[in-house]
C-alpha cells in the first residue's frame, strides 16, 4: 500500500504496483505492538516473462532477463526474486526445468549473481524500509479474496452466462463444519494429547512419513502416557479430522467456474470424510445442516442440481 524509510514520517504510495522488489521491507503488526515481519515483494515483470514469454526454452535468455532487473540507480545490494508456479518448469514449458538448472548451475555466477535465500539476505542486510500492506489481497483475485468465498467475477471463464454464486454457500457450509470440528478437537484433544495444539501442528510429520516407526515416535512424544490401543486409534482419527478439515479449503476447488467440476467435488469429498470420521465422536447430526446450507449452491448445469445433490453423490461413492 505504502512505504517509508525507517525513521521518516512521510509515506510513499506504492498501491498501483510500483514498489521496488529488490529489497526487503519491515511490516509492524498492529495487533501485536513490538512485533514485526520482514517481507519481500517479487518482481512481477520478470515473473510474468518467465511464465508467459518462453524464457524457459533457453537458459541464456532466462539469465539475461534476470539481469534486466538490475538497476545502476540503486545504491544497495539488489535482490532479484521472482515467483512462478512450479508447473512452469516442465508442464507448461517442456524441459523448462533443464533451462532453470542450466541457469542456476552454470550461468548465474558468471553473470555476477550470488544465489541466496530470504533468510540469508536478511542476515546480511537488515530491512531499513517500513511497509503497510493492502488488507485481504491475493495474486489471482482483483477483489481481495473474493475468489474463495463469493461470486466476485474471477473465474476461468469460457462459459458466458455462468456464475459462481455457489462459492458463498459452499464456503458457509465448510466454515460450519470447520467450526464444529474445532470445538470437537478442543474438547476431545485434552483426553489424548499432552498439548493438543502442538500435536495438531506436528501431525505433519506423520503425514510425510506414515511408517510404523514414525507413528510410534509421534505418539510417544505427543500422546498422554498409558493410552490403550483403542484410544490411540481415536486420537489419530481426531488428528486426521483436522487434516481433512484443512484440505476442504484447497485453493483449486474455488478457482474454476463450476461447482460440479472435479476440483470442487474433491473438496466436498474431504468434507464427507470429516463427517464420516466425526461420527464416532459426536451424537449430533452434522450432515443435515451441512447439506441444508449446500442446497443454496446452485450448479450452472441444470442436471447437476445443487451442492447438496453433489455432496450426496460424493457420500455414496
Where are these regions (language model features)?
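Active-site and substrate-binding clefts of carbohydrate-active enzymes
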Residues: 9-309, 313-316
